[in-house]
């Protein structure tokens, strides 16, 4: 069964980001290794071999984490010969940022009277 990415390319920031999609993104980002991968890719597209060396991870372990991030919609990849290059999907990060900003803005709203 194909995995639906959390973020649909080209959608306005948080309009397409519902609770399920936000949960998928936050879950993908909750792992310390995946955060290291995201930070490493903040400088631009990288080959898997570069990431394994920089992060000190076995290729199989890194591949698992890259798959989780890609399926969440946070990464894109391309193959060039026998190498696979990964890059961040800025749209996903912007949508998550927008969703968090809306959530933060709603925190300041006063409570409605009850009873």
PLM regions and their residue ranges:
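Amphipathic alpha-helical dimerization/coiled-coil segments
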Residues: 1-21, 90-115
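Short acidic/polar alpha-helix capping motifs at helix-coil junctions
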Residues: 11-15, 47-48, 62
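Short, structured secondary-structure boundary patches
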Residues: 25, 72, 82-84, 98-102
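N-terminal helix-turn-helix DNA-binding core of bacterial DNA-binding proteins
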Residues: 20-60, 80-93
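Alpha-helical residues within the helix-turn-helix
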Residues: 53, 64, 70-71
């Amino acid at each position: 069964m194909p995995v639906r990415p959390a973020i649909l390319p080209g959608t306005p920031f948080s309009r397409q980001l519902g609770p399920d999609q936000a949960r998928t993104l936050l879950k993908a980002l909750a792992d310390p290794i995946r955060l290291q991968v995201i930070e490493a890719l903040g400088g631009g597209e990288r080959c898997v071999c570069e990431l394994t060396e920089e992060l000190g991870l076995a290729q199989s372990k890194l591949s698992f984490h890259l798959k989780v991030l890609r399926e969440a919609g946070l990464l894109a990849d391309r193959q060039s010969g026998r190498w696979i290059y990964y890059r961040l999907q800025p749209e996903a990060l912007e949508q998550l940022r927008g969703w968090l900003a809306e959530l933060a803005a709603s925190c300041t709203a006063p409570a409605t009277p009850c009873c």
